[in-house]
Amino acid sequence: MNKTEMVSSENALPGGHTPVLAMPFFHRVTGDRLDRPFPSSETIYLAMGCFWGAEKLFWNTGGVLQTAVGYMGGLTPNPTYREVYTGCTGHAETVRVTYDPNQVSTEAILTVFLENHDPTQGMRQSNDVGTQYRSAIWCTTTEQFMTATTVKGSYQANLLNAGYGAITTAISMANGCLLYTSPSPRD
């Protein structure tokens, strides 16, 4: 299988019957309970390469209430890290960003996203190659979707003026929840 082509449903790994991590559980670095409710918050899911580094970007973004890493956009139920790494699940490494829209705008969150990875690389980021490293945005509200589309268009114009190619970032509505990953790739 080509690492830069999405797996078909016929060739996707079968996956597991139960989630890799069951709730409740806590963020390994911050200690936050990951099923903690945040009234008046919004959540957006961002894929921009390796999720460990991407998640750290949002820890220091004002108005971000919580982050978590896992997988979205795939075919295989309850995949493990090793399964996702094969490219045979269809999932992307993803950061869940929960934020207070009264403190930080969706546009500001998306600016951090776009300015901290190369959204023109397709199924890779730098030396990390594979569908799991693709650039994607999964929105949870129609307003987020419209904002993401507008921000992507503006950013695309700037990239073209600077001599870069087309943005390959996929934007869609989240049609499922984040599949949490184990705290370590060895798990």
Regions found by a protein language model. Give the residues of each.
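A short, hydrophobic C-terminal helix/tail in secreted or cell-surface proteins
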Residues: P183-D187
